[in-house]
Amino acid sequence: MKVVEVKHPLVRHKIGLMREGDISTKRFRELAAEVGSLLTYEATADFETETVTIEGWNGPVEVDQIKGKKVTVVPILRAGLGMMDGVLEHIPSARISVVGIYRDEETLEPVPYFEKLASDMNERIALVVDPMLATGGSMIATVDLLKKRGCTSIKALVLVAAPEGIKALEAAHPDIELYTAAIDKCLNEKGYILPGLGDAGDKIFGTK
């Protein structure tokens, strides 16, 4: 599995701001979208382009346009919604495919409860967004679902990843790509990433 830890200074700075314990909901939400935007820029760097001729202001002009499969952004509910706008900033025409999965706090296992995917998943590149890759369970379950629906090109975008989650995701889906703003130290006994960001969903939505 291709794993990319994006070490751009802007990404490192913004993730550092998100680690502040007393950060406001507004600020955390803004930063989640901003880092999501920067990760999208990195994850789409290998998209193929083709040269086409258009009618410019002073006659025909050759320009580059992205070719190949179209994109669907796949936020994992609910926290993934906080990164979605960052993707759409660059790819406003992307279809939105939603997957609802929550983690059982006792077993730490993923529990799926909702899905609404683009009808042509086999013809699209899926950019799956979820702030935290902890145990990897939710991401693995989401990729399982996307593959069952015919999607063969999948990139996962997360703010923070734990080594345990990366290992589990690679074992289950070695053919996908992972882009993360930070690879943290480990998981604690409750399955939270250390040092991590805390509960990203609560911080994005202002709940506890």
From Swiss-Prot:
Coiled coil: none annotated. It comes from the Bacteria. PANTHER family: ADENINE PHOSPHORIBOSYLTRANSFERASE, URACIL PHOSPHORIBOSYLTRANSFERASE, CHLOROPLASTIC. Disulfide bonds: none annotated. It holds the Pfam family UPRTase. HAMAP family: Upp_B. It catalyses: UMP + diphosphate = 5-phospho-alpha-D-ribose 1-diphosphate + uracil. This is Uracil phosphoribosyltransferase. InterPro entries: PRibTrfase_dom, PRTase-like, Upp_B, UPRTase/APRTase, Ura_phspho_trans. Binds 1 Mg(2+) ion per subunit. The magnesium is bound as Mg-PRPP. CDD domains: PRTases_typeI (cd06223). Catalyzes the conversion of uracil and 5-phospho-alpha-D-ribose 1-diphosphate (PRPP) to UMP and diphosphate. One of its GO terms (biological process) is uracil salvage. Keywords: Allosteric enzyme, Glycosyltransferase, GTP-binding, Magnesium, Nucleotide-binding, Transferase. Belongs to the UPRTase family. The keyword Membrane does not apply. GO terms for molecular function: GTP binding; magnesium ion binding; uracil phosphoribosyltransferase activity. The keyword Glycosyltransferase applies. Allosterically activated by GTP. 5-phospho-alpha-D-ribose 1-diphosphate binds at R78, R103, D130, P131, M132, L133, A134, T135, G136, G137, S138, D199. Pathway: Pyrimidine metabolism; UMP biosynthesis via salvage pathway; UMP from uracil: step 1/1. Its cofactor is Mg(2+).
